[in-house]
Structures are given as C-alpha cells and as structure tokens.
C-alpha cells in the first residue's frame, strides 16, 4: 500500500535529526524521540529542524440536513492534525502534515435514502465518501513537500495545498482537497505569476491519493447528455493537469487575472477576470468574468457513454458583479450566465465554482443554459471579531429532464444563506466558531420524484463548527 509508505517517509523527515540508536535496553526510559537539547550551530540540519514551526489544529463539525418528507440526517465529526515546516537551509525547507477524523455520532450514512435511493450528500462528506461504514480509521497524510524560496520566487514539489479558480481547497467539510505535483510562484508588489503540473489528488471527503483520471468520478457522476448514467468513473485516461495563471495590477485599483487549465486528454479551460477593488476614497467595486471550455481528443474516452466531456459540446461562461462598501457593510449584486452550447464541467473533486454567484452549499457545475442572480451582504463588527455573511440567489436552470444541459437533474431554485463567524480573544484566543444555515426552495417542477429534490431543493441545512489553532 502507498499510504503506509508515505507515513514512513513523513516519519523519517520528522526524526531525521535524531542521533541515538533505536535499540533500547529494557531497564532504560524510552528515548524513541531522541534528546530535546537545542542545537546551537545554525549551519547544520539539526538546527534547521529544531527551529522549524509546528502548527496544530483541532476541529469539531456538526452537520444536519432537513429534507422534505424525511427524517433529519445528522453527524458530529471531531478531528485534529499537526503541521511541521523546517527552517530554510540554503533556501530549502521541508513540510509535512497529517490529520485524523472521527465520527462521534451520526444518523445512518451507509444505506441509501428510502425515498430517493441515493446516499447521504452533506453529512457523509465529513468522513470518507468512498467507505461510508468507516467511522474511526479516517486519517490522511496531507502535506509532504520540499520547498525552495528565494526573494520573490517559490517552488514547491510534493503534496501541498492549492487555491486557484479551477483547483481549490473547497474546505467546507472537515478537510480540504489536496494536490501533488510541482507548483511555482513569482510575486512582486503588484503582480503574481503561477505555473505548475499536478498528477495526484486527494479530494475533500476522501483519505487516499488518486491519479488524475482516477480522481474524477469519486463524487456523483450525474448523467450523460442522453440521460443515461455517466460511465466515466475508472474509465478515463489522463497524465495530469498543467495550470498557469497571472494576477496583474492595473491602474486605479484594478486587477486582471488570466488562468488556463489543461487537463491532458480530457478538456481545457481558460478564465479572464477583471476586478475593480474598493478603496476608502472609492467604495464602489465591480468585476467581469469570462470562462471558455473546449474538449480535448474525445473527452477522456472515445466511448460516448464513458467520456467526461462530450465532444459535441463546449461551454462559455460570463459573469459580472457590482458592489459597494458602506461603513461596516459590504453589499453586492452578482450575475452568471452559462451558454447553451454545452455544460460547464469541472471535476467537483478538485474544487468549487469560481463564479461570482457562488453561495456556500451548492454549485452550478454541470449546467448549461443557466442564469444566476445573487445578492450578497457582509457585516464586519467594529469592536468585535465578528463577521456576518448573508446571501440570496435565484438560479434559473434548464428543466430537470433536459439532460444535455442539466447533468445532475437539478430543479431551478432559490437559495438563502446565513454565515456567522466569531474569533475568540483573551483566555479563549485561538478558538473560532462558525454557524451556517442555508435553505434551497425548488421553484420549478420536480415531477413529484424524490430523487429530484432530496438533498437538492426544498431542504434546509445547518452547520456548527469549532476550530482551535495553536
């Protein structure tokens, strides 16, 4: 198994500074972790490891879902992890982290819902979606990398965290999505440039590491454009993902972004986005976004029943927003349009939508011929570490039975979000609390079929999250 090997490698890195033999006499105190004496010579490797940084994270996540005509589904997850990063030596440093998750209590997450015959969607995502029966052995080696950093250049090789428009953390569960590969960054005061090659993914709600093609299809696969179940899981071929990007500062508080994602043998996505940033002297802001997608070869498999991106389709997305900061408040209106030429496709295993109209709890990936209208408001307290985020959106989707434009058979819906965050101070410094509630209301025909509304619409969802960082 690869997993034990990776943990062995991580252990080697953490213990590399030990000089003691591992054999212990039976009458000796255990010395497996070596001596604790601080090394004074800053030129050697031992000093660099001893002067490294350690970050700890404890997390509690309660989740419950209220579906129409159904019992409440719930889960309480708890977990913790450690991250270590050595002090640089010749501009090189090493990082490693791991995390465990435990199912403290939950409703039945193993058997399909009795009305829709589908597995739980939200609560199961706190654990391992590939093994719903696993409640205790949920652990993952998350980061294991070597990093070169000098002046404005950073190059990271190995398992790492990445946050870009197309591949991102999507950290709305216990643990985020992680990637493996090489990632380089150049940053100066106004501009940032990125480039990398990725060949492994460990998606949110999983514990293993998967090759690029294997990682696509771990989540729900939806349907083909003719309405038959998509068959691309374990049927795709791809060597990896090439990702490049740039963020360039323009005059008068404007920023433009360019991103291109090349998924070998499957599809290519390009994004251009320009944003005017708010300032005290100019509190108004706006943004424009365009995304284009084209199929590569046969979309991953020449068999149309097993392809990820059907060769007959392409997609174009246009987005816009306009907002104003007013004292402690920030208000915006947002719009997204996906054209009729095809579905906007992006493996959900790799991250959330980059659209201005994204609201926590749902995505529009897999849709074509979509119009989304969203209002967002944010309140930041002056004298308290308190943020309140609110959102309301109308998502005009194609009919559920228009399979060519509606991959997951989702009804048009209204969504209402409330997200409250508080960072404790004083004695409780390090603790953070978050309360989330959203409700989705179907506004078009669900054909009285539970599989079209269970965990999709006519439902509410509640989260209470506690984090302790140390």
Question: What do the PLM-derived regions correspond to, one by one?
Answer:
Residues 60-64, 98-104, 150-152, 159-164, ...:
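Transmembrane beta-strands of outer-membrane beta-barrel pores
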Residues 103-110, 194-241, 283-355, 362, ...:
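Outer-membrane beta-barrel translocator/channel fold
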Residues 69-73, 138, 169-176, 200-204, ...:
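Solvent-exposed loop/turn segments connecting transmembrane beta-strands
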């Amino acid at each position: 198994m690869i997993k034990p090997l990776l943990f062995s490698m991580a252990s080697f890195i953490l213990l590399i500074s030990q000089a003691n033999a591992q054999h212990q006499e039976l009458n000796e105190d255990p010395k497996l972790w070596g001596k604790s004496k601080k090394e004074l010579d800053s030129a050697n490797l031992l000093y660099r490891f001893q002067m490294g940084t350690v970050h700890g994270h404890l997390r509690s996540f309660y989740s419950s879902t209220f579906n129409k005509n159904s019992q409440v589904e719930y889960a309480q997850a708890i977990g913790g992890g450690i991250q270590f990063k050595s002090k640089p030596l010749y501009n090189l440093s090493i990082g490693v982290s791991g995390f465990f998750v435990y199912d403290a209590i939950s409703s039945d997450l193993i058997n399909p819902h009795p009305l829709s015959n589908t597995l739980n969607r939200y609560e199961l995502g706190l654990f391992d979606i590939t093994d719903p029966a696993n409640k205790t052995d949920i652990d993952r080696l998350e980061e294991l990398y070597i990093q070169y950093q000098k002046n404005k250049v950073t190059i990271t090789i190995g398992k790492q965290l990445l946050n870009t428009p197309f591949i991102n953390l999507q950290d709305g569960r216990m643990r985020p999505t992680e990637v493996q590969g090489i990632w380089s960054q150049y940053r100066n005061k106004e501009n940032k440039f990125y480039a990398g090659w990725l060949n492994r993914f460990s998606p949110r709600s999983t514990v293993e590491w998967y090759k690029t093609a294997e990682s696509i299809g771990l989540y729900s696969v939806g349907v083909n454009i003719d309405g038959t179940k998509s068959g691309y899981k374990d049927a795709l071929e791809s060597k990896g993902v090439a990702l490049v990007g740039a963020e360039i500062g323009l005059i008068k508080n404007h920023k433009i972004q360019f991103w291109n994602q090349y998924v070998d043998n499957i599809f290519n996505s390009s994004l251009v986005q320009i944003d005017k940033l708010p300032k005290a002297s100019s509190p108004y802001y706006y943004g424009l976004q365009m995304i284009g997608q084209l199929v590569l070869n046969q979309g991953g498999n020449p068999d149309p029943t097993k392809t990820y991106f059907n060769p007959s389709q392409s997609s174009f997305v246009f987005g816009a927003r306009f907002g104003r900061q007013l004292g402690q408040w920030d208000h915006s209106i947002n719009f997204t349009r996906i054209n009729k030429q095809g579905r906007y496709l992006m493996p959900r295993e790799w991250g959330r939508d980059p659209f201005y109209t994204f609201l926590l709890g749902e995505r529009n990936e897999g849709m074509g011929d979509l119009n989304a209208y969203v209002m967002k408001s944010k309140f930041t307290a002056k004298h308290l570490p308190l943020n309140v985020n609110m959102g309301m959106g109308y998502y005009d989707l194609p009919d559920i039975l228009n399979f060519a434009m509606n991959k997951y058979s989702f009804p048009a819906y209204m969504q209402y979000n409330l997200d409250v965050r508080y960072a404790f101070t004083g004695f409780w410094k390090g603790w953070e609390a978050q309360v989330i509630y959203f409700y989705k209301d179907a506004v078009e025909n669900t054909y009285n079929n539970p599989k079209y509304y269970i965990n999709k619409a006519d439902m509410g969802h509640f989260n209470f999250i506690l984090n302790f960082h140390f």
